[in-house]
Amino acid sequence: MSTTEIEKVVKGASYSALLLNDCGLPITAANIAALFKTAKLNGHETTFKTFEDFLKTNPITNYIGAIGGSAPAAASSAPAKKEEPKKEEPKKEEPKEEETDMDMGDLFG
């Protein structure tokens, strides 16, 4: 078996494990083999058993979502603040002085 064939089997087993987990089925060598048979892929029972044994001690849910969680380098580390619409406060009306008709002459008596 060449390296590319081994890589295909490992990828297929990985995808099978993800699919079985997503469907809520146990990740066993028999279930992985059934998926390979359905997809008309060639694989070895030892590879399927290796995946089953590994995933018994290391649940696949530990690896889901753990990849690529970092932010781009250009992004700031602080979360962006949401701008809330400013509430306009009602303007207080200043008391108006009563307007009187005054002439300049009334000022001096």
UniProtKB/Swiss-Prot annotation:
Q: Which residues fall in a compositionally biased region of kind Acidic residues? A: 96-109
Enumerate the residue ranges of region (Disordered). 71-109
Single GO MF descriptor: protein kinase activator activity
- Which GO cellular component does the record give, naming just one? cytosolic large ribosomal subunit
Q: Does the keyword Ribosomal protein apply?
A: yes
Q: Could you tell me the keywords of this UniProt record?
A: Repeat, Ribonucleoprotein, Ribosomal protein
Supply the HAMAP family for this chain: Ribosomal_L12_arch
Record keyword Magnesium present = no
User: What residue range is the signal peptide?
Assistant: none
In the record, the note on similarity to other proteins reads:
Belongs to the eukaryotic ribosomal protein P1/P2 family.
Annotated region (3 X 5 AA tandem repeats of K-K-E-E-P) at: 81-95
The biological processes this protein is annotated with in GO are: cytoplasmic translation; translational elongation
Instruction: Give the encoding gene's name.
Output: RPLP1
**Gene3D superfamilies in alphabetical order:** 1.10.10.1410
Q: What is the protein's species of origin?
A: Tetrahymena thermophila
| PTM field | Not phosphorylated.
InterPro entries with a match to the protein in the record: P1/P2_N_sf (IPR038716), Ribosomal_P1/P2 (IPR027534)
**Residue stretches of biased makeup (Basic and acidic residues):** 80-95
Q: Where are the sequence repeats?
A: 81-85, 86-90, 91-95
Q: What is this protein called?
A: Large ribosomal subunit protein P1
